[in-house]
Design a protein with these regions (language model features):
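Small-residue-mediated transmembrane helix hinge/kink sites in multi-pass secondary transporters
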Residues: 32, 73-77, 132
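Extracellular/periplasmic helix-loop-helix junction of adjacent transmembrane segments
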Residues: 30-69
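Conserved MFS/SLC helix-loop-helix module at the cytosolic interface between two early adjacent transmembrane helices
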Residues: 70-106
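Hydrophobic core of transmembrane alpha-helices in multi-pass small-molecule transporters
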Residues: 110-125
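Extracytoplasmic
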Residues: 8-42
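Residue-level signature of mid-helix packing/kink "hotspots" within the transmembrane helices
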Residues: 25, 64-73, 158
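Intracellular juxtamembrane helix-capping segments at the cytosolic ends
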Residues: 124-138
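Glycine-rich segments within core transmembrane alpha-helices of 12-TM secondary carriers
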Residues: 141-159
């Protein structure tokens, strides 16, 4: 009965992770387009500029992982003090800023900062609040509820 009460909350958490997976796919599948946008000459695949452009996109993706690593340690404490709902909303707001940054920036440095912030949004905000929220909303089988998060991240790879 309790899971039914929190069904929309669980679905919102799942869809947050769907956007997380989409972010990673968008960056990796459009690396040439992003490199062009960030000012790299991507006309000759054999040139050093082409390789530098691809490296810049890879760097932005790598900063996502670093943002996760840095923020995962304090996210749970913040979630306990501030509340899960506020952290989920804050993570969504950070993701919106990151997507806008990736979309409009002309700088690989700004894109790397956006990557870092998206990592913070994922681990520091969403992981710290979404995982416990899903577990608490479905106490009968919390492991299965958490598997739903991984399922939605996986589905995002097919979208």
């Amino acid at each position: 009965m309790r899971a039914k009460k929190y069904l929309w909350s669980i679905l919102c958490v799942y869809f947050c992770y769907l956007t997380h997976g989409i972010q990673a796919i968008i960056l990796s599948q459009n690396n040439v387009n992003f490199a062009k946008q960030w000012g790299f000459n991507m006309t000759d695949p054999q040139s050093a500029a082409y390789a530098a452009g691809l490296a810049a996109v890879s760097t932005a993706v790598a900063w996502t992982g670093f943002g996760k690593f840095v923020s995962v340690w304090i996210g749970g404490e913040i979630s306990d003090h501030v509340g899960r709902k506020k952290l989920m909303i804050g993570g969504a707001a950070l993701y919106i800023l990151c997507f806008l940054g990736f979309l409009f920036t002309k700088s690989a440095l700004v894109a790397s900062v956006c990557g870092f912030v998206s990592g913070v949004a994922t681990s520091g905000f969403w992981d710290a609040s979404g995982y416990p929220a899903v577990q608490e909303a479905y106490p009968v089988a919390p492991g299965s509820a958490l598997s739903g998060i991984k399922f939605f991240v996986s589905v995002s790879g097919m979208v």
